[in-house]
Amino acid sequence: MSSFEGQMAEYPTISIDRFDRENLRARAYFLSHCHKDHMKGLRAPTLKRRLECSLKVYLYCSPVTKELLLTSPKYRFWKKRIISIEIETPTQISLVDEASGEKEEIVVTLLPAGHCPGSVMFLFQGNNGTVLYTGDFRLAQGEAARMELLHSGGRVKDIQSVYLDTTFCDPRFYQIPSREECLSGVLELVRSWITRSPYHVVWLNCKAAYGYEYLFTNLSEELGVQVHVNKLDMFRNMPEILHHLTTDRNTQIHACRHPKAEEYFQWSKLPCGITSRNRIPLHIISIKPSTMWFGERSRKTNVIVRTGESSYRACFSFHSSYSEIKDFLSYLCPVNAYPNVIPVGTTMDKVVEILKPLCRSSQSTEPKYKPLGKLKRARTVHRDSEEEDDYLFDDPLPIPLRHKVPYPETFHPEVFSMTAVSEKQPEKLRQTPGCCRAECMQSSRFTNFVDCEESNSESEEEVGIPASLQGDLGSVLHLQKADGDVPQWEVFFKRNDEITDESLENFPSSTVAGGSQSPKLFSDSDGESTHISSQNSSQSTHITEQGSQGWDSQSDTVLLSSQERNSGDITSLDKADYRPTIKENIPASLMEQNVICPKDTYSDLKSRDKDVTIVPSTGEPTTLSSETHIPEEKSLLNLSTNADSQSSSDFEVPSTPEAELPKREHLQYLYEKLATGESIAVKKRKCSLLDT
């Protein structure tokens, strides 16, 4: 039973399937089909007076509905005010207010509803959006997708509201057998009964005057027997139905209706009062098409159920089932959905709760725009949920990893310096374990690993660590050993240099006491190697402005000529003025080779000796080893503590007493380089992290 009041919120000046109360002021009327619950007030005296006072009010319906309506004398006063619209034909209608002359243009399209002969749905399009009124309808799943006029440009039209037939919008009626299934069951029962004898008769107990024509026409066509009905006037202009119906009572299939049909049935008489010939009693069975009765069953039943000695129920419906309603609405996906019928045993609020999730209003009404992103790369994304259009596009592609290049000018971490001191200054090594641990973590965390051109020797000797450093450095070296994420240089490079016992007799090793896992930092050369240790050295050291940043940041290297390499001298200074000293004695045969040294190593061109002493920046755990063995002349590494040199300037390094001026033949290679136009320069480093 329809509960629709007749007016839509989008177009309140028209009335549909309701013709009383506020609807009397409508500018136009629409009738979906000829069932009494949709015709309230259609023949009321008040509406007749309205038509008499108006010249531009009309009733719009389908051609079949017009024929069915005008067959009744009660509705013949509408004859001059009914306009039929062909199905699936968009028609423009002008809604005129006769008092003010205001005019509104709308386009109306009639769509088949599948409810009964002539039943249609109304699709309204105008300034207030697109609205669909279904009336009573029965559409199977997927039929909405086959209606072209519900689509535009290959997609469903943007529908603002749907006024929906919700007669069976109840989970109890989740699935209703199709009309074809019901017809198959009824056809089998009727055939098995009427073929027994001419006195076996079937009565189709149908409540409504329209809607069961589908059964009548198909039974008559399959069995070759016409169906008896009370009147044929309504089908006079429908020959496809009229051919299968008759008013002759002498037939085996009846669909006649009588106000006291049940009484006639109790006395074994048909509503039409037909009796048998030759006083032979008739054998009559009744088949009542219904849907509500099946919805109240707690167990699944067949399409045809026997309810008495001669009575049957057939599950036949011309309203959409619960699943068909959801399929229809979810396909259209309107902004709003309003129920036209309150199902038996439920409330309007429950129906609205069912319809609301199927509408766009339950989601965001604003369209979601997403960039297409980078289409050159495909990416598989695993979803935890299956949520509509939020996962249509892939997430933005990740930024490619960048190489770890140090930027000392932008990042200045706090470094806990620890310098090696002489026996006269043991208090400088008395740092707390917390400071040492922080220094180790800082150095290992911010150390970047760059390519090194030098290969380490395959045979690495282990030397002892002084007892004065074991207590303070034990925790630091043990912590570094536990850090398995820091790679060792031995994994990437091999040692090719030979180590002499004389060169290591005065040098301690950090690998014996603590087993440090920190990377070994060193300067590289084509013919020699110089290894450095800061934590294990017993000297008092300091970093100059030019050499303070090299061992922390692992930055660029510069080429030194053979003259600079032979005259390199790095003197050890105190903590306030630290400068490493390099003393080399290289034969002239090797002076033609360039030495690749770290950028932060400061070479004194005025000093030259057989001993080489290199001390790196503080806070950088390294390994001390000997230089590569040279066949012509061995260069030994000896540790020399020179406390007097602590007063040297950052810009001028005085020559040591043992230094000699470079000989002329030593400078020959340098002059050749200058003659060819090749530039030889020692680049200066920027301010170190430790200088801050």
UniProtKB/Swiss-Prot annotation:
GO terms for molecular function: 5'-3' DNA exonuclease activity; 5'-3' exonuclease activity; damaged DNA binding; endonuclease activity; single-stranded DNA endodeoxyribonuclease activity. The keyword rRNA-binding does not apply. SUPFAM superfamilies: Metallo-hydrolase/oxidoreductase. The modification Phosphoserine is found at S385, S645. Disulfide bonds: none annotated. Changing H33A: Abolishes PRKDC-dependent endonuclease activity and V(D)J recombination. Ubiquitously expressed, with highest levels in the kidney, lung, pancreas and placenta (at the mRNA level). Expression is not increased in thymus or bone marrow, sites of V(D)J recombination. InterPro entries: DRMBL, RibonucZ/Hydroxyglut_hydro. One of its GO terms (cellular component) is Golgi apparatus. Changing S548A: Reduced IR induced phosphorylation. Changing D136 to N/A: Abolishes PRKDC-dependent endonuclease activity and V(D)J recombination. Residues 506-520, 544-555, 640-650 have a biased composition (Polar residues). Belongs to the DNA repair metallo-beta-lactamase (DRMBL) family. Interacts with LIG4; the interaction is direct. Interacts with ATM. Interacts with BRCA1. Interacts with PRKDC. Interacts with TP53BP1. Also exhibits ATM- and phosphorylation-dependent interaction with the MRN complex, composed of MRE11, RAD50, and NBN. It is linked to Severe combined immunodeficiency autosomal recessive T-cell-negative/B-cell-negative/NK-cell-positive with sensitivity to ionizing radiation: A form of severe combined immunodeficiency, a genetically and clinically heterogeneous group of rare congenital disorders characterized by impairment of both humoral and cell-mediated immunity, leukopenia, and low or absent antibody levels. Patients present in infancy with recurrent, persistent infections by opportunistic organisms. Nuclease involved in DNA non-homologous end joining (NHEJ); required for double-strand break repair and V(D)J recombination. Required for V(D)J recombination, the process by which exons encoding the antigen-binding domains of immunoglobulins and T-cell receptor proteins are assembled from individual V, (D), and J gene segments. V(D)J recombination is initiated by the lymphoid specific RAG endonuclease complex, which generates site specific DNA double strand breaks (DSBs). These DSBs present two types of DNA end structures: hairpin sealed coding ends and phosphorylated blunt signal ends. This is Protein artemis. It comes from Homo sapiens (Human). The lineage of its organism: Eukaryota, Metazoa, Chordata, Craniata, Vertebrata.
